[in-house]
Amino acid sequence: MKRARFVVLGSGAASPAPERALPAHYFEYEGVGALLDCGEGTQFQLMKAKISFSRIKVVFVSHLHGDHVLGLPGLLQTMAMASRRDELLVIGPKGLKDFLLSSFELTYFYPPYPIKVVEVLRDAEITYRNLKLKVFPVNHTVPAFGVSVETASKRKVRADVLEREGLPKRLWGRLQRGEDVVWEGRVFKYEDFTFEGERIKVVYSGDTAPCERLVEEAEGADLLVHEATFTKELKEEAHDRGHSTAEDAATAAARAGVKQLLMVHFSARYKDLRRHLEEARRVFPRSYAAEDLTKVVILK
């Protein structure tokens, strides 16, 4: 059985609030962790969630507004103080590399471990070990991206069929690797005798107003993590500022046919999220409002 976990480290928006940290989220599958955005204070939230910094192999920055990125230089320095030696993959928009290099230079920081920065201009698909990250543009006031994180899937053999056909088990592994097998003059095509195992798919919106591309990329996801900065009476303001309402998030979830919606990125003006939930559940019943350190475990 596949098991992944998603942890909301910071459920707030641009203005900090005592009860809500700035945007940051963590996805982990088979020991490989991906940090999705890194607002100020993310280090403290990781410690509260008991997530080891060394488990973070990939960092995705959705855009360069401060509430999504200003926690990253400090986190990278703390990783160095913890004697990190593993490479860290950092993915984000154009300008992220200059931002990091400037912060390193001005704070006299010389990373003792390799940091690979991949800047995305439009679309990108990046595979890291057992994770496939698909980065796509969303609808914000500055260049901004959402991301689909999908677990790798190993092909599985149709054991009952292969046993009936008499193919020796020692050859099954080749079919699993996507190779055709010739045995006793017969060709066994891998696509006829194997099938794709189930994948776990989580999609994170970053900051966005309603976005058709996001709906397309979220299709069938196990979890859609979507910003819901405002409720619908502030819909016009939300869209003008490149943000979504709870109703917008639920509409995206319903159209994409996702299994669950987790709303995040709440304006500091909201102390009570009941209106967000009521608004969203009228459109998509499986809607939830995140608190800091909310954890979702996905099993398949």
Curated annotation (Swiss-Prot):
Domain of life per record: Archaea
E.C. number: 3.1.26.11
An example molecular function term from Gene Ontology annotations: 3'-tRNA processing endoribonuclease activity
Binding site for Zn(2+) 2: 67-68, 207, 265
Keywords assigned by UniProt, alphabetized: Endonuclease, Hydrolase, Metal-binding, Nuclease, tRNA processing, Zinc
Keyword Zinc recorded: yes
Database matches in CDD domains: RNaseZ_ZiPD-like_MBL-fold (cd07717)
Active-site residues from the entry: 67
SUBUNIT field: Homodimer.
Protein name: Ribonuclease Z
Native source organism of the sequence: Ignicoccus hospitalis (strain KIN4/I / DSM 18386 / JCM 14125)
